[in-house]
Amino acid sequence: MSFTPANRAYPYTRLRRNRRDDFSRRLVRENVLTVDDLILPVFVLDGVNQRESIPSMPGVERLSIDQLLIEAEEWVALGIPALALFPVTPLEKKSLDAAEAYNPEGIAQRATRALRERFPELGIITDVALDPFTTHGQDGILDDDGYVLNDVSIDVLVRQALSHAEAGAQVVAPSDMMDGRIGAIREALESAGHTNVRIMAYSAKYASAYYGPFRDAVGSASNLGKGNKATYQMDPANSDEALHEVAADLAEGADMVMVKPGMPYLYIVRRVKDEFRAPTFVYQVSGEYAMHMGAIQNGWLAESVILESLTAFKRAGADGILTYFAKQAAEQLRRGR
């Protein structure tokens, strides 16, 4: 859409007029961030009464399920509509075939049941991916040459997604980037009677260096070692490819799509929203959080940068944001910034 201003010449047009007072700035504000836009990712540990700090993500902790329920009381009271669960798998439960991913008594499955029972109004989004469960840290099953096998991996992902739906997850979020996994998961959910379980597809997930602290948090960094995920996650240099990925996922039955990472990919968010007009989400990933929080803690940036960064996602076209700042943002919004 082109924009051609007509007869808007200074001094008759003074764009600062509407900026003069707070009330007029509020009246003409184009994008508004609310707590309804926020999804809080959380890391869940095995055990009882466990809390572990994550050095690369200051202020974020891994929590056992009992501690998660305690913290969730405050998150729900703040109005945060949904949590995204990421399990921290003990080393002894990791394997080449990622069988723990679909264990009905796995961490994610038990956490989902506990949260749904305590907070039935809270949205629970579960991660469908194999990297927390494999000994090599990749998102799929490997062949003898170390290449991730697409269709074999999908079979495991389907079993994982079904186990999450059976535990009560309202949204499953495949983050693996295997071709065709959305269609396979949708078909399996329909066949099992989970017709209202939504799929939030990590459609445009880039092979990014911004994920480092997350891999520390879930304990997959040491398993992955010097490996990378370039054979299935997207090349950061590509833009058009994101549209092909989103189109495929929507055609296969995704209810929502996601762009990840966030701030370095705002233009991708805009392109996806303009092209498809589908529910579009964005992930302010661990590296983005670590940079912002580090700067805030050192006094280099004001805490107001949290809402500014999240508003940028809304301006780019995002309908919702996964952010480790969800609690702080909700508190700031409640205070009126």
Give the residues covered by each predicted segment.
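Alpha/beta enzyme core
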Residues: S2-T4, A9, D21, T34-I39, ...
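N-terminal leader/domain-start detector
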Residues: R20, V28-N31
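Acidic, Ser/Thr/Pro-rich intrinsically disordered transcriptional activation regions
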Residues: R16, R20-S24
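N-terminal intrinsically disordered, cationic/polar leader segments
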Residues: P11-R14, R29, V35
